[in-house]
Amino acid sequence: MYGILKKSLFISMAGTLLAATSCQMTPKMSEKECVTKNVYENVPFEMPEVLKPVFPDYQVNIRDFGAKSGGKELCTEAINEAIRTVHKRGGGTVVIPAGLWLTGPIVLLSNVNLHTEQNALVTFSNDYSLYPIIDTSFEGSDGKRCQSPISALNAENIAVTGQGVFDGAGDKWRPVKKMKMTDRQWNALVKSGGEVDKDGKIWYPDAGALKASVLMSKKGVSKESISTDEWEEMKAWLRPVMVSIRKSKKVLLEGVTFKNSPAWCIHPLSCESLTVNDVKVFNPWYSQNGDALDVESCKNVLITNCLFDAGDDAICLKSGRDEEG
């Protein structure tokens, strides 16, 4: 699909409808302001306004929970403890200030806005042990994957906002096809470590990922037939989507940049009232399954002012696969 998409899209997944809105700009109005102001005008079908989350004024800073910038010390517990604290208090905002922050998986909870200040860079660790294997859904089918860097399940009134950047460390997860790289890129990648298949066409981040690829290509072998202990040895094969929002309501992603995702970047599944505004996604053009946004089985979704430069599809509309669709 298109590598870069910068349009106003208005989606009702209840009827799987999609329409681009028109905008009448005034001399003093920017394109983004025009889109936001006029998004509900001239829609060719009946569509309720997408509800956005609202948060109490209460605010905490991850530094207050022991987070240290610099990219050397894990801030996983500090960030998640800040989120839990705000959630238990009834809601508010967790601020990630400017700086380099190294972390494992972040779990969003109801009534919490995770807000990144300008010049905040959140880098997710490439240590596979930090990402437990869970039951989830990917590419339209239920199955096991590693926990996503950012996730929410059965949450309501949640957001990720601000001007910060999230780096998913996807280069440590994704396989790479030789045909998608220059000779210089390929040679540098192979020299960096990892494993190459017997045909010399695909690079894998470790021996476990290659083993899983060979195993899954055999007739009669299914993911369900492989034990959790076996998957632990092949964990890199179970690369997660970067942002997994499941069965949640009133979700806002705004202003932030996501890059270098292990698989799909943003995957809302079975959500209602989702707004994605002014979000940027950057993945290398050779990234395997590097979709920017996959909206699956959702209802009332508004996407505006976004820039997606992805290694695969920019925006996909999905509703499961086969019997699960």
Regions found by a protein language model. Give the residues of each.
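Extracellular "leader-to-stem" segments immediately downstream of a signal peptide or signal-anchor
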Residues: 2-17, 21-95, 100-113, 117-254, ...
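Conserved residues at the C-terminal ends of beta-strands
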Residues: 97, 269, 318
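Right-handed parallel beta-helix
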Residues: 118-119, 156-164, 249-259, 272-284, ...
